[in-house]
A protein has these predicted regions:
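Charged, amphipathic alpha-helical regulatory modules used
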Residues: 1-110
């Protein structure tokens, strides 16, 4: 039987919850963002560590700063974030997963 996805066991749901309840500003304050994320998904340490690494390398800020921009700028931000992460040793699979979680949270994808 497949494990049911809930807020507590799914990064994309947690990010979407944060965006829906706190808006884009929660992602601009990295300390508040990480504390909130740790509280929402305490059992997803691997995902949380990946988010922290992406914040440290400014990959997340590339996506966040493009939030209210044109689609072309969003696409550029996605590619920039992807390049940052892969050049810093994050696998293609993990990079795609992480960025897709943020895109889902921001309603850029379904």
């Amino acid at each position: 039987m497949k494990k049911k996805r809930t807020l507590q066991n799914n990064l994309s749901y947690a990010l979407k919850y944060m965006f829906g309840n706190y808006g884009i500003n929660i992602f601009l304050d990295s300390k508040k963002f990480i504390v909130t994320l740790d509280n929402l998904i305490p059992n997803l340490q691997e995902e949380t560590n990946l988010v922290k690494f992406a914040i440290q390398k400014n990959a997340i800020s590339a996506i966040v700063n493009a939030y209210d921009q044109r689609d072309i700028d969003k696409n550029f931000a996605y590619l920039r974030a992807k390049t940052i992460l892969t050049k810093n040793g994050v696998s293609e699979k993990a990079t795609t997963y992480l960025l897709d979680c943020f895109l889902y949270a921001f309603d850029w994808i379904d």
